UniProtKB/Swiss-Prot annotation:
It holds the Pfam family TLD. The keyword Cytoplasm applies. Its main location: cytoplasm. This is Restriction of telomere capping protein 5. May be involved in a process influencing telomere capping. It comes from Meyerozyma guilliermondii (strain ATCC 6260 / CBS 566 / DSM 6381 / JCM 1539 / NBRC 10279 / NRRL Y-324) (Yeast). It comes from the Eukaryota. Belongs to the RTC5 family. It is found in: Cytoplasm.
């Protein structure tokens, strides 16, 4: 007699290969008919359930990738394609059905099947290498019991049976083994660099996005690779990354990794012919960054990925080339607190301040005044540099300011969304934990983030740096970032200590000579349009006032000529 077709659940034993086939059929149903048709067209096949072999070059063409990131992605898909029985690491090809399984896993679509599988562990295993020279095959040959949500006539008809598998009850899926595995740091750099390239591409018509992907991989890879190097500093310093360290880093890097994999799957499954995509997000004016020394595509992507990882309102800030507005460039407008005020204070949306310079190696005369006004934490006998700090370091910090700027000579401003980010020489994040953490002082005390109000009375000038703070002196020439995690610090605490695992518990300072200072406005399309209208209105008002003044000047001159104070030739009259 055949199996009962009642609604009662039952189990059936399958070989590991049959279990993989069941999962393959289930994953194929997670892609839409249009996506399946597109993939068949790209693979030049009649069905996506084929054992046709794809080489690394084939996959690179399918995903629009080149070396070096294509090899990392290829190995990742190879291993996941054989899930739940991860493939051997020396496999040289991947089949079409394995590609679909891997794609549904890395994109997160597999969650619709209610698999009891940890996504982070899946990604780690896909990127990882085993310490062992070989993997025993005995465990892979054991039959697997598969539970069904209802009875079926023929459990050996795998395509039909796959529709009724209770994937949530599959034992072993939830326990992806991570012990004894590690990720090569160099491969992690390549993957993060690729995802930063993807993150830098604004959402619009697919064909435009994919064209930009190819262009940036060809032309801008080195700058994104350097940004990928910076991101890996969030992972404990080792050439071999364990799961524990990888998992900790995903707390901040998770959104970047997830979006990157989703984008690649979309590239694979989307039709980019001109007629296929009629919807397009309106593209704003492209950012002109040629004059900026601190902002480029890779920097924007790095900041955007960091904000996304922070969560909260920071994650809601969309950072692209299209929604950044140049407000102030010290190299263009001059390094003056008044110039900074005139350029920045009219902007009523979030801003990003970037300050960069060279580490102070010798005391110069102009610095001595600032040094005398800035309280020392370290004894003169202590070395001013930690092992990771070098005398010739370039130092760059960014500050996300969520509230509009204001003169604050008596009371600080700002909310808890204010965030300090160290960009160079090590990437780190210092989250705001208290409001009123910013001052903009026009009476000779500069800018402070995380400080109390400075003292400025008669002949006494004194800064009051917080335990985690960035201080910029009034001439915009010198700056100090202070990070005191010990109880010895006496300043206020407006920012949390860094998230870098290696140095978050240490006390240190970055003192530097400022070479560049820039402020960029961040806004949605609506905010940018409203701000433009406001600026246009202010410009017209200024022109109108100038016109009135010129007319008034003409009337005043005629009156002076009548009384003989001004002659026709412009010479003064006698009294």
């Amino acid at each position: 007699m055949g199996q009962s077709s009642s609604a009662e659940s039952f189990s059936h034993s399958y070989s590991p290969q049959q279990v993989h086939t069941l999962l393959s059929y289930a994953c194929q149903r997670l892609i839409t008919p249009v996506e399946a048709q597109t993939l068949r067209k790209k693979l030049n096949s009649t069905t996506v359930n084929e054992k046709a072999q794809l080489s690394r070059a084939d996959l690179a063409q399918l995903l629009l990738l080149n070396d070096p990131p294509s090899s990392v992605v290829y190995k990742c898909l190879q291993k996941l394609g054989k899930f739940p029985f991860f493939g051997e690491e020396n496999d040289s090809t991947i089949t079409a059905d394995e590609l679909i399984v891997a794609s549904m896993l890395i994109s997160g679509r597999f969650k619709k099947l209610k698999l009891n599988t940890d996504y982070d562990k899946l990604i780690f295993r896909a990127l990882a290498t085993s310490k062992l020279d070989a993997v025993t095959e005995k465990s892979e040959q054991l039959p697997v019991s598969v539970k069904f949500g209802r009875g079926i006539e023929n459990p050996e008809h795998l395509q039909m049976a796959s529709r009724f598998v209770d994937w949530s009850s599959m034992s072993g899926f939830e326990s992806v083994d991570t012990d004894g595995y590690f990720i090569s740091r160099s491969e992690m750099v390549q993957l993060l660099a690729l995802f930063l390239v993807i993150y830098s591409i604004p959402k619009r018509k697919r064909i435009s996005m994919q064209t930009e992907l190819s262009q940036k991989l060809d032309n801008d890879w080195r700058s994104f690779e350097a940004a990928g190097e910076q991101l890996t500093t969030f992972i404990r310093s080792s050439e071999k990354i364990s799961y524990q360290d990888f998992s900790s880093a995903l707390a901040l890097l998770g959104p970047l990794v997830h979006y990157g994999f989703e984008f690649l799957v979309d590239v694979m499954l989307s039709d980019t012919t001109e007629h296929s995509d009629t919807t397009e997000t309106k593209k704003g004016p492209d950012l002109e960054v040629t004059k900026s020394h601190l902002i480029n595509s890779s920097t924007i992507a790095l900041l955007a990925a960091t904000f996304a990882g922070l969560g909260g309102k920071q994650a809601g800030i969309s950072l692209t080339r299209q929604n950044l507005v140049k407000l102030y460039l010290g190299s263009e407008s001059g390094f003056s607190i008044r110039s900074l005020e005139s350029k920045v204070f009219k902007w009523h949306a979030p801003t990003i301040l970037l300050v960069s310079g060279e580490r102070l190696r010798t005391t110069i005369k102009r610095y001595e005044t600032f040094d005398s006004e800035y309280p020392r934490f370290f004894r003169s006998s202590e070395s001013p540099l930690k092992p990771w700090q070098q005398p010739n370091d370039k130092i760059t910090y960014a500050v996300l300011v969520h509230e509009p700027w204001k003169v604050s000579n008596k009371k600080n401003f700002g909310d808890t969304n204010t965030t300090i980010i160290a960009l160079e020489p090590r990437l780190d994040v210092f989250k705001g934990i208290a409001s009123e953490s910013i001052y903009f002082n026009t009476l000779g005390m500069g800018l402070g983030f995380g400080n109390s109000q400075p003292i400025n009375k008669n002949t006494l000038k004194r800064y009051a740096p917080g335990s985690v703070s960035l201080t910029i002196e009034a001439n915009l020439e010198f700056a100090v970032f202070r990070h005191i995690s010990s109880q010895a610090g006496s300043g206020i605490t407006s920012f949390a200590t860094g998230v870098q695992p290696d140095i978050s518990g240490q006390d240190y300072e970055d003192r530097f000579l400022i070479t560049d200072l820039e402020v960029w406005g961040v806004g949605s399309s609506k905010e940018l349009e409203e701000q433009k209208k406001q600026w246009d209105w202010e410009k017209k008002q200024a022109e109108a006032r100038q016109s009135v003044n010129l007319r008034s000047m003409g009337e005043d001159r005629a009156l002076l000529e009548m009384v003989g104070l001004v002659g026709n030739h412009g010479s003064g009259g006698s009294v």
